[in-house]
Amino acid sequence: MKRKLVIGSVVAVVLALGAARAVRSQSTQDPLDPLKIAPDTHKLALENAFVRVLDVHVPPGRTEPRHRHPHGLSVYFTDWDVRVTREGAQPEVRQRKAGTFQWSEAIVHTIENVGKTEGHVLRIELKF
């Protein structure tokens, strides 16, 4: 199972890099950058001209303050339950499953781990 997750993660990164046509500059001044908002749970794993990859670990009961992600791909490594509150929307509880992937457009949101297991996500943010 872990081997499949690692292979899937590598494939996701390769696809993201292969799709790059233009480079969008990353705003290092963004006050909603999750690396600034929640540095204890969001770690920079890789950054180049095309992508920024965040290794995210959200413990049970933890609420992540309002933050922003550009469009990109999330790779889930653990099963966990998360309450997602998108800007201007009602909160939704979602189940994340290990080994699954999810594309999302740019988002501003707050998340809360409402389950009993740590959420582990690799967030691949595209810079184009």
Regions found by a protein language model. Name each.
Residues 79, 106-128:
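Ligand-binding loop in jelly-roll beta-barrel domains
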Residues 61-64, 100-112:
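Histidine-centered metal-chelating micro-motifs
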Residues 1-9:
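Bacterial N-terminal signal peptides that target proteins for export
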Residues 10-15:
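Hydrophobic helical h-region of N-terminal Sec-dependent signal peptides
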Residues 88-106:
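Short acidic-glycine-tyrosine-enriched beta hairpin
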Residues 38-67:
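Mature N-terminal segment immediately following signal peptide/propeptide cleavage
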Residues 16-31:
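Bacterial Sec-dependent signal peptides at the C-terminal "C-region" and cleavage site
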Residues 69-88:
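Glycine- and acidic-residue-biased ligand/ion/polar-headgroup-sensing regions
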